[in-house]
Amino acid sequence: MSKLRNLNRQFISNLKTHETVTNAKRNLILSILKSTTTKREARNYLNKYQNQFDFSDITFNNGVPSNSLEKRDSQRELFINRFLNKQNPFTNIYDDETKLQKIPLRLALFKIKFQSISLENWKGMAETFKRLIHLGISPIIMLDYDHLPANTFRNNELYMLNQTNKIMNILGKPTEENDLKTIIMRSLFTKKTINDKDLAIDNLESVLIPLYQGVIPIIQPIVYNASTCMQEFIDSNDLLFSLCSSLLTTKNVLSIEKVVMIDPIGGIPSIERNQTSHVFINLSQEYSDIVSELYIGFIKPEYRIFHMNNLKAMNKTLTLVSDKTGNDETTGIITTPDIMSVNNDQLNPIIYNVLTDRSIISSSLPTSHNRTPELSTSILKKGVDVNILDALNYPKAFTLNNLVQDGSVNKSKLVDLIDDSFGKKLDTEKYFDRINDSLATVVIVGDYDGAAIITWETCSKTNEKIAYLDKFAIASVNQGLPGLADIIFKIILQSHPNELIWRSRKNNPVNKWYFERCCGTLSNPGSQWKIFYTGDIFNKKIDKLKKQGIPGGVNIHGKMHQYSDITENIPPSFL
């Protein structure tokens, strides 16, 4: 009878455990769906991170059941057992008994300038770390001690140990179940010679095994110099770069998802945004321009040095990751302790970027709009190359035929991109003949991953030429890709800041996106088109009365007639 009673208790306990686990899974998925703004974002996140969780009874890809060895816990056990048995943990890690799907650790590297971080902020940051782990991210923390003098190693070492222990106590004690588990790592790197700048990790497993056990490594900026047999401090940015370089030697077991700098001065400042941060930086295109901007003198020299160091370090690190992995999936984030401590998925830029792979607001939103918020966070990507073609920088007549003949534009790739983006066939010869002599600007991103064509269109009533966004195309595989549409549209607005118009069918779902980026819209009842307009001229006073002209103002009534005349008279481009 007692055995039966024990079995009954065990059965009830198992039911409760199953219910708890099921509820946890359901709550996780619901929180993901709530925090992402589109189905595509939710799907992309779940496809990328689903194997970081034990979703054994939930499938995301056509109902295919997940192999038990494909789960992170199984991989942890295999990895650790091999290491303890003095085997190479990285050899055929996915080939025991069955071919296993690769399940890399999803890493986020945090470089934290911690001196002025308050206790309250640390507590909030600890909650952010917990949320990141809950979402499948494995954090690594590097504390920035660059403010210490370089000639007093012993005193610095004691200070570092004391500060790290304080931070570990704030983040949580390993004995407490719900707290974060952390471990201090020092002398992780070795310098072979006195002048050697290339640092190496002799025992990478010492970093990876804690990560597989759910423990956060806190790495001290101390290196062992093999030639002098002494320990030395290293610059925190050099530490970040060397850590990335070492981790990327084992790309089959990990991926570096985020590189995060937590700094009280925040993201990279922008003149355009009233010295608040650049929202998104496409480093391949904007790096040199932003460096030049920082030297204009709109910020104090002492702050400029810090921002320059952050920008250079992020560019160097993201370039390394991009070169070694062959992709642009790693995101850089520079933000403040205050912002990292925000415990709201849609307001915390780090959490939001994990879920959506983009910034909280769009970088192409007009800075002049009151509804566009000002931020202290910059999102950075190595990004894509951008080619901007216009009459000012072209030695011959700026026609499409000339651009094609001298190889500046690949006609077949451009046509393929437009066909793919719009889902219908371009009437190629007719379209190119129409725009050949009226070309204003051509923007080509990457290997025709996206493009824009802007033309000069003439109003039949006033003969005034106005810039018209004729084609805005993004390859279907890249549609929804974070940042690409923003990169192109931002260039479009910068190329024609004074006045720009475009049209879109009234039932186009993209119209909401367009509406957020324009100064106004026009829609004639009998037309299939919605007309959008923007430009600096609309920041001036608007003269709404035909008979009373305001000097320097805009006759909005006349402009609407011009825009309507132009857009209604442009012939269809597709077959």
Curated annotation (Swiss-Prot):
Family the entry assigns: Belongs to the acetyltransferase family.
Record function comment: N-acetylglutamate synthase involved in arginine biosynthesis.
Organism: Debaryomyces hansenii (strain ATCC 36239 / CBS 767 / BCRC 21394 / JCM 1990 / NBRC 0083 / IGC 2968) (Yeast)
Catalysis: reaction(s): L-glutamate + acetyl-CoA = N-acetyl-L-glutamate + CoA + H(+)
Keywords for the protein's UniProt record, in alphabetical order: Acyltransferase, Amino-acid biosynthesis, Mitochondrion, Transferase, Transit peptide
Subcellular location: Mitochondrion
Gene: ARG2
Protein name in the entry: Amino-acid acetyltransferase, mitochondrial
Top-level taxon in the UniProt lineage: Eukaryota
Coarse class of the protein's main subcellular location: mitochondrion
Enzyme Commission designation: 2.3.1.1
Record carries keyword Acyltransferase: yes
